[in-house]
Amino acid sequence: MRIQGQRIKKMRFIQTDHYVVAVEVEMVIPTDDPSEPCYEPETVEFLRQVKLHAEQSDLAWLKARGKVYAAVAA
């Protein structure tokens, strides 16, 4: 079920021990409560998948969906 409202694109950053992944996601400003944007269930599941693939170092999958940054030792 899609939430009714204005759709906006936002960049979200998913951080793990070895990577930071930047992905663009869609947020919705609901017409019933426009106080703040929210995620639809599909977007929440996508963000979970990004984190899971980052933890597994699945770089091919991650690069197909966003930008991948590697952590370096200080």
Where do the model's predicted regions map?
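C-terminal-biased regions
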Residues: 1-55, 59-74
